[in-house]
Structures are given as structure tokens and as C-alpha cells.
Amino acid sequence: MKRENRSKKYDYFNSSSNNSNKFSKTNFKKYFKIFKLVVYIFLIGLALTGCIQSFVVQSSPNVGAGLELYPSKDKVAPRVNVYKKEENGYVKDRNINELLKDEQSLQALKDFSKNHNGVYGKTKSSNSALAILEDNTYIDSDGQENKSIIYKDNSGKYLFFNDTLTTYDPINKFTDIYAIGRLTERDSDAIKFRENNPKIIEHLKLFKVSEVPISREYQPNIKFARDFLQALYDKTLKLPVYQNILRADGSKYASFNEFLTSLEKRTTNHLKTQLNKQELSEEDLNSITLSDSESAALNAYLTRVNPLISENGFTGLKKSLNNADDFELVYSQGEKIAQSDYGQIPVVTWGEYWNYGPFYALLVAPIASFTNWVASAFESGFGIVFAIIVVVVVTRLFIFGLTFKVTFSQYKQQELQGKKAKIDAKYAAYENNKMMKQRKQKEIQDLYKKHNISPIDFVASIAWSSPLFIAVWRVIQSVPVIKSNFFLGVNFSTASYQEILAKNWVYLWVVSLALIVQIISQILPRWLAKKKIKERANVYEMQSYKKNNKTQNIMLIVFMVFTITLQAGVQIYWIIGGLWTIGQTLFVHHFQKTSFFKNRVRPWLDRH
């Protein structure tokens, strides 16, 4: 009984009890270090996987193509090709990356695909839809405002195609479409004007675009291609520059096509007259002389309609079925009419994220869900930029919390730079001696151990930040509501440097700001550290500092080149992330000077 009532305080003098406690603490620290090392290796592995998958799993700047992260299946959108009305024609506006949000229209596209034995939103399928924009308003076939964006006929049928469809029914009536020449460089002489008189046309060669049989068995992609072209062609020929010929006093043409074929016939007769060396009569000369309206229309046709035919895939050549001596343009099988560079990969469920591995399932999925949730509160413009700001702040705060100890322990490493530099100098003459190298590493390890610094802890910052940084970057690239955003004249899906090379100077502010922020965010920590080093630097420490500085300068140049090549949306993210880095650097620098840090935080860091 007496032994049971004995105070536990006497156990202090029991050496075996003390050794047991020390052993358990030592083992705990040892296993905890191993656990941290395993976690860091796993995180770095995730970062490397994400980096590799960024190239393997293709993304596209276009909505409706490449990897896309949607909040639900009902939001999966197609590739919408926007043709904007410009002078004398319709031109594809590559600065508009339209995201179809209308639920009724999206459901109609699903039903359309199902009715034609296709699957809407199937992984790696290509799709395409047409939208026509006039005076900042989308229109339908009647020229009326079209709130559903996608071009449709009077019955409400959309001009849409998915390459999983087995059939396709055109919404337009196919009519004759003519190209001036074969649309290749070697046929640049398909039209010839008299020297010093551009109103006298001496030669014109037309190539008819082949009509596609309307049988259900005919290839649906070719029928869609012809339907797509017909819609744009019909809209183009309704413009005043072409209609003026038909409305002119004494006009003998019922259609613009009739004007073209008549002109071709007249120039052919003129050529025969020249070959027979007959004298050209005044009547013959008048027949090949264009009026002002005819000259304007012909030049407009060359600059607007010919490119439409070419860019929509009708560049092949075959003998005409109606005339064995003539040829017509046919659809090139290798073309994908107005479709995107990559098949669409819509990802919605967590299971679909797992199909691409743990990087997507564990990191990209939650960040994408949060981003879509925040972005859903905004339509476009600055609202989407604000959503990116929220995502950056949340992820960076999370990283800052996880790397708090490492971030504020850097002052210790800075104080030890001088001592480490002395060790480096001590063994500088033994670069090729393996035994002396081992002794050098042992001394450096003992130095860090003495001051309670673990090299593993400094891997933590890279281990936590790298996978999250790549994951957010991937999300910014792949969330459609961000890809389709337009802010201060900048399309988020466009590569800024390409626009600048095309003399679209509005993109200069994005590239310039991204570069400036990137330079400051990398130079500022070095500049602040240099101020500290100069206060107490020795020769060895300055040599070590200069050596590290050269390496960092090379990395800065690499990052600058990388920044220039990014899409505008990612550059916006780069700017926001860089501003956070600058703010965090200044906060840490000044916070370390406060009495609170010196009296509370630093002692805690020294103990841990």
C-alpha cells in the first residue's frame, strides 16, 4: 500500500523512466520527420505529374475544345464561331470566345444530337456552331435579334454540328456559290484587269462550289460544311455593295451570280477576239468595262467571299458532273469546318477527375469547383477578374499557413550564411577530394543541427506551393467562364504576344504589367536580403551572395520569356499572384522588425 501511495515526482530520480521518455520523444521526432519527407515527396510528385499532364492533356483557348472544367453536365457548351459584319462582308472575329449559357439552347443542342444518333458533350468529340453578329447584336436567318446566340432558321433549327452525328439535315437551301479562281497562289491570274485601268476586266475564271447531295447517307460533316458556308454566303450577298448592281437603273441581272457568270462569258469572248487578232469593237470594249458599282462589288467579292470559301474547307478540285470540261471546288476531307484545334474533354464529376490521376482529383477538382462557384456570381469583365483574385487569395493564404514556420525561419538561414560561406571557403581547395567533400557536408549539417534548422523544412515551401500553383494555373486555363472573359479590350483566351505582333496594341498593358510585376516579385526579396547582408557581410558571404545572384538572374530571364508566351487570362492570374508575392515579402520583412515578432514569434521558432 505504501508503494502505491508513493508520489510520482520521485520518478524524476529514476534514470530508466527518463531514458524511456527521451526515447519516445526521439522516436516521435524521427518518425515525424520521415512522415513529413514522405508528404513532401508526394506533393513534389503531384507537381511534376501536373506539369507533365499540362502538356499531355491538351487544353485549348477556345470554349468547346480541349480540357474544360464545368460545374455540371447541363453547362457543357459548344464551340461558337462568331462572324462579325464588317465592310462588304462577314469576317470571323477571333477575339470573341463566346460561352453559350442559355439553358434552353443547350438543351436543344442535346436533343438535336440525340435525334441524329449523336452524343452531345462526348469526350474528345469536336463540335461547331455559327453565330452572326451585326452592330453588337446576334441575329438569326431573318436578321432579327437572336438571344440564343447560335444562328437558326425560321423553324428554330440551329446551325450546329457534332462529329458523333451520323446524319445531318441542312437548314439552308443550297444555291450556286462561285469562287474567283481556285483560291491558291498559282491561280492569282484568275482575274486580270487592263493595265492602268482597273475597270476594264480582260479575264475572269469562276469555280463553282460543289453542291452536296441531300441524301441521308451522304457524309454529315460535308453537308454541315456546305450549310455553314451557304448561311454566310446568303447573308453576304444581301449587303448593299452587292445589291446595288441589281437595283441599278437598267440592270439586267436577277442575281449576283448571274452578274458573275455573265462577266465570265464576256471576258471569254474577249479572249477569243484577242486570239483571233480581231479588232475590238466599241461594243466589245463596253461589255468588259465595269461600272463603279460593279467594280466595287467585284473587289468586295474577292476580299470577302473568296476567303469564306477557302477558310471553310472548299479547296479541293474535281471534274464537274454537269460539264466534263469544267472543274468545281469540293470539300477537303482533312478539314474540320470551323471546329477547334482539339476535341472537347468536359470534366464534371470527381470520378472523371480521377480518370486523369490524383493531381486532378485531389487538387484541380476542389479548386475548379470553388472557382466555378465564385465565378457563377458574375457575368464577365471585372467580375471574373475579381473571382480570380478570390481564388488567388484563398490558395495563397492556405500555402502561407502551411509554410508559416519556414517563411519566418529564413532569418536564421540568412544569419548562418556567413558561417556556411566560411566552411565553403575552407574546403574550396578540395573540390575533387571525395573524403573532404563528405567532411564539408558533415560540418554544414552540424551547423544547421546546432541552430535547429532542418533542410527538409525548406523543401516544404516548394512542396506545398508548386502543386497548388500548377493546379490553379490549370484551372484558369480550363474553366470556360474564364476562357471566354473579355476585360479592358483583352480576350482572356488569346496569346497576348500574337496580338501585339498583329499590331493589336491594347494587349501591351497586359504583357507589360505581367513583366513588371514578375521582375519586382523576384528582385524584391533579393534586394531586401542584400541590405541585411551588407550590414554584417564578410568576404565569404559576399562571394556566396554573388554566386547565387547569377543563378537567380538566369531564372528571372527564363520566367520573363515564359510570361510573354502565356495567354492573357493566365497573365492576369500571373499579375495577381505576383502582387500577392510582393505584398507577402514586404509584410514578412517589416513584421520581423516588430517587438511582437522578436518577443513572441522568434522564441517560438527557436524552440521548434
UniProtKB/Swiss-Prot annotation:
It comes from Mycoplasmopsis pulmonis (strain UAB CTIP). Coiled coil: none annotated. Keywords: Cell membrane, Chaperone, Membrane, Protein transport, Transmembrane, Transmembrane helix, Transport. Its main location: membrane. It is found in: Cell membrane. GO terms for cellular component: plasma membrane. InterPro entries: YidC/ALB3/OXA1/COX18 (IPR001708), YidC/Oxa/ALB_C (IPR028055), YidC_ALB_C (IPR047196). It is a multi-pass membrane protein. The keyword Transferase does not apply. Interacts with the Sec translocase complex via SecD. Specifically interacts with transmembrane segments of nascent integral membrane proteins during membrane integration. The chain crosses the membrane at residues 37-57, 382-402, 453-473, 505-525, 556-576. Belongs to the OXA1/ALB3/YidC family. Type 1 subfamily. Required for the insertion and/or proper folding and/or complex formation of integral membrane proteins into the membrane. Involved in integration of membrane proteins that insert both dependently and independently of the Sec translocase complex, as well as at least some lipoproteins. Aids folding of multispanning membrane proteins. One of its GO terms (biological process) is protein insertion into membrane. This is Membrane protein insertase YidC. One of its GO terms (molecular function) is membrane insertase activity.
